[in-house]
């Protein structure tokens, strides 16, 4: 049960970090949209935490190579991906 709580805490923290990206108007719209999609995946309670994290990682890794992304946003996305990679069932 403790692992599930830890996973949910990591997911909540990742959602919070992604929410900052979504609310940052200096970030291009397509990147904010991808962050919103990742949040939506992370909040889908019908899936296990690891599957939700993997889905979000896929979205974020795809967008992380965008040349228009500000450097601070890229670093934030890498931090979120690193955190989500530790989520396991």
Swiss-Prot record:
From what superkingdom does this record's organism come? Answer: Archaea
HAMAP family with a match to the protein in the record: UPF0147 (MF_00342)
Q: What is this protein called?
A: UPF0147 protein Saci_0891
Alphabetical list of Pfam families matching this protein: UPF0147 (PF03685)
The similarity annotation says:
Belongs to the UPF0147 family.
Q: Which InterPro entries does UniProt cross-reference here?
A: Ta0600-like_sf (IPR023130), UPF0147 (IPR005354)
């Amino acid at each position: 049960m403790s692992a599930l709580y830890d996973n949910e805490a990591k997911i909540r923290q990742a959602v919070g970090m992604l929410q900052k990206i979504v609310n940052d108007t200096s970030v291009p719209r397509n990147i904010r949209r991808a962050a919103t999609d990742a949040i939506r995946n992370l909040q889908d309670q019908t899936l296990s935490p690891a599957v939700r994290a993997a889905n979000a990682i896929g979205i974020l890794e795809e967008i992380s190579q965008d040349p228009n992304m500000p450097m601070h946003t890229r670093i934030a996305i890498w931090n979120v991906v690193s955190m989500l990679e530790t989520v396991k069932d």
